[in-house]
Design a protein with these regions (language model features):
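Acidic, low-complexity intrinsically disordered segments
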Residues: 1-215
């Protein structure tokens, strides 16, 4: 089983490791599933890749392979959220160096959205890539993408409870699950653990974790 090589959008799972989310295999994060749920709702063909799959793709296909893939795209979306200290036994979250390199390789003009706590942190540290039609989402990446697909305009948006429920359901059977490297081959039959989001924010941010991201 494999994904379509002619998919119109590329969804890159940079892994989301934050105080309330693991996001690194054998877990699949909720925000990346919501994002895929948006594309499912709009009936947009897309290809899902983890950052580890992307690294393997670059090594296997080289610059020509990367260029061919990028030039076939109509859009790009990435979630990056590694903001807590820790060591990883399997997957490694995307770095800002890798993110910059990927952005440079994107065709000029195609819509691209980057979201997640790492993106917000990098932006606060001064990262403001100058590229047409690239948007750094500071609120809900999924809702921001949904608004763009409806209006062709970038605007920071937050999802409604109804959207939250719908995209969670669509994302549960999206390519973020069906084509996750922990499930998609006989050599990797699972398990794959769904992370579930039941709450946003934290009431203990004033006297909580040292690596708190809420303030």
């Amino acid at each position: 089983m494999g994904e379509s090589e002619s998919a119109k959008w590329l969804v890159l799972d940079g892994y989301e490791d934050e105080p309330a989310a693991f996001g690194v295999p054998p877990y699949v994060g909720f925000h990346i599933r919501y994002l895929c749920g948006v594309l499912e709702q709009h009936n947009i063909d897309y290809r899902y890749m983890t950052i580890d799959q992307w690294r393997a793709f670059v090594l296997a296909k080289g610059e020509d392979g990367v260029s061919n893939l990028m030039n076939s795209l109509d859009g790009f979306a990435c979630v990056a959220g590694a903001v807590v200290p820790g060591k990883y036994l399997r997957g490694t979250p995307i770095s800002i160096k890798e993110t910059k390199d990927i952005v440079r390789k994107l065709p000029l003009g195609i819509p691209a959205i980057l979201g997640g706590w790492a993106i917000r942190g990098w932006r606060q540290q001064g990262w403001t890539p100058l590229r047409k039609n690239l948007f750094l989402a500071l609120q809900d990446t999924d809702a921001t993408l949904d608004n763009f697909l409806k209006t062709a305009k970038w605007k920071h948006c937050r999802r409604t409870p109804e959207q939250w429920s719908n995209w969670a359901k669509l994302g549960a059977s999206s390519k973020a699950v069906k084509f996750h490297p922990d499930l998609w081959s006989k050599d990797n039959p699972g398990p794959l653990t769904y992370e579930v989001e039941v709450y946003q924010g934290c009431v203990r941010y004033k006297r909580g974790c040292k690596f708190c991201i809420e303030p």
